[in-house]
Amino acid sequence: RDSSTSRGLGDVYKRQGVISTAQIGFEEPDFVGNEEACNLRSIRKHIVRAKELASGKGMIAVNVMVALQQYREHVKEAVRAGADAVICGAGLPVDLPELVEAGKAKIAPIVSSRRAAALLLKTWDKKYGRTADFIVTEGPEAGGHLGFSREQLDDISKIRFEEELTGIMEEKKKYEEKYGKQIPVFAAGGIWDASDAKRIEALGADGVQAATRFVATKECDASLGYKKAYVNAKETDVKIIKSPVGMPGRALNNAFIQKTERAPESVERCYHCIKNCKPAQIPYCITQALIRAVHGDVENGLVFCGSNVGKIDRISTVREVIEDLMYEKEVKMP
């Protein structure tokens, strides 16, 4: 994910940018009590705006969490609004081909293991006669929700992610042959610069996906306080948490995390975000926590981040980050 909403995406310069649809309508004036309509309205608004800023070049995709109550509606609205691709994680999107008519937009899962990729590709093939247009393989150093167990993440050195990545590339071959097309694989999680991109692509991957560095850019529409939390973070400030979503995640170990680990925060209302959420049993409302943080109240909110956040020492630009990820530094973007 290059940036969360349309303003940053217009500056991704002829490459792929990804909009996250999770509670995307939070800045709409009527969001509270009207979350579903605001989210759908904002999906369209941000896709249209991103395409305008990109002048029709590159690809604008959306990331839709399978765990969302509005998962199916978000996917359908993104396609109607003209998204070039729909990428789904936080659960296996077994029904994604049903929601996206062939030829309308590309479809791609986010997976963290060969086993998950094999299951999904087999299901899509048998049930829908379709296959993935590309695959995002997310490793254990990514930010936000992670497709690994808490026990695995307690010692990521034991996770053989490169083996999983090469296994996924092997798994897709039979479907490439059957459907007569290439299925590119993009690796995500812990991608910092061109050396990481080279290492990943040397394994056979087609490219990388990066997110954390793009938060600390001038173009990102998060508050200055949120960006400064990234800039000021040290490696030791990062922690694996248990999210109200029910999955482990990587976030800054700030005052909010420490407080809610000692005692749950009262949940005053439901924002209808997660399918299986039980407000009386969760440590805090993830929607409220994320909104507080992105507005700048970072010590009272949830700040997701990747493992490399401690390397960020300033607020840069989208151009600088992309050039850092490119192989040839002497080749500048137009």
Predicted features along the sequence, with ranges:
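Alpha/beta enzyme core
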Residues: L68-I183, A194-S195, R199
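Glycine-rich, proline-tolerant flexible connector loops at the mouths of alpha/beta enzymes
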Residues: V18-N39, A142-Q152
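Short loop/turn motifs at secondary-structure junctions
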Residues: G8, G56, G82, R130-T131, ...
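Single conserved hydrophobic/aromatic residue that forms the stacking wall/gate
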Residues: D2-L9, Y13
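Hydrophobic faces of well-ordered beta-strands that scaffold small-molecule active sites
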Residues: R1, R15-I19, I60-V64, V86-C88, ...
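Active-site beta->alpha loop and helix N-cap motifs at the rims of alpha/beta catalytic domains
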Residues: E35-V94
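Conserved active-site-proximal phosphate/metal-binding subdomains
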Residues: A142-F186, W192-P334
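Glycine-rich beta-alpha junction loops
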Residues: Q23-I24, V64-L68, R114, G139-E141, ...
